[in-house]
Amino acid sequence: MNRKITFCIPSKNNLRYLKNSIQSIKENSLHQNEIIVYVDADNDGTKEWLDQNNIKYLVNDTDIPKGIAYGYNRCIEAAETPIVCMFHADMYMGQWFDDAILKHLKPLSVVSGTRIEPPLHPKGLEKIVEDFGMYPEDFKKAEFDKFVYEMRYVYQGKTTKGIFAPWAIYKEDITSIGMHDEKLHSYHEDSDIFNRFILNGYDIIQTWEALVYHLTCRGGQFQDGIEQVTKDEFFHLMKNSSFKNYVRKWGTFIKNDEYQYPTIPHKYNVGIHIKNCNKQILNIIEPWGT
């Protein structure tokens, strides 16, 4: 079997969404592709479901999540195809997404698809806002499929310069720059690697013929039936740790243009003189100053 792309999908207690995601890849791919799921500190039956459906997966059996960066890296290492695609468990792939990606992908390039999102977040020049449902149970599949079919002709040949999930790259190219920085856990790992792609001269392409419906992290960031974000203490610790590590590394905050193409400012260095400093004060000040 000559498989083209490995879809890498980290998932933590997202079985409800993951089922739809995997179904869409199987049904809507033009080519034979591979799927690898990284099951991260899971307790919702994902591993058992993957076993039953003969889906390749890797697993973190501990109670402590490793994070999306770690999950992506393990999937990339295990991929048996020359091309890997970073995919989210709450994405539903439109028809022939894979073929549209392959049409533009070449060595030393990164190709992103185009997200269609419900009106949960503001509009952006890099995405399409259309409401095809907020949850897997109310997903309007027939309407979405029709929309994708029509938009493939409307956007035929259209590309812009932006980068975000889902994105694809040659396995050799992402391996050569060290893959994702695992110190960034589950947050800002994408901005970090996008910056490194640009600094290494990779061509950044967004194709508007490769469409996905994105439930905007409903599975990971929202409890079922509750509209407000709910996070535990561990989440906030990981997020704050990742953000500080990003600033330590880049000396700046994350910046993108209107199409979500990263702009990399000059690294700043702020010196702060504190009298009678102690570890508690230093922990608050660092990494904002040195």
Features from the language model and the residues they span:
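A short, conserved alpha-helix in the catalytic core of glycosyltransferases
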Residues: 161-178, 183-211
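Conserved donor NDP-sugar-binding/catalytic core segment of glycosyltransferases
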Residues: 92, 96-135
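Short aromatic/hydrophobic "clamp" motif used to bind/position activated sugar donors
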Residues: 84
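Glycine-rich, basic loop-to-helix element that forms the pyrophosphate-binding segment
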Residues: 61-79
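A conserved hydrophobic helix/loop-capping motif in glycosyltransferases and polysaccharide synthases
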Residues: 5-17, 21, 28-29, 38, ...
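A recurrent flexible, glycine/aromatic-enriched loop bordering the glycosyltransferase active site
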Residues: 147-169
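Short, acidic, metal-binding catalytic loop of nucleotide-sugar glycosyltransferases
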Residues: 23-32, 287-289
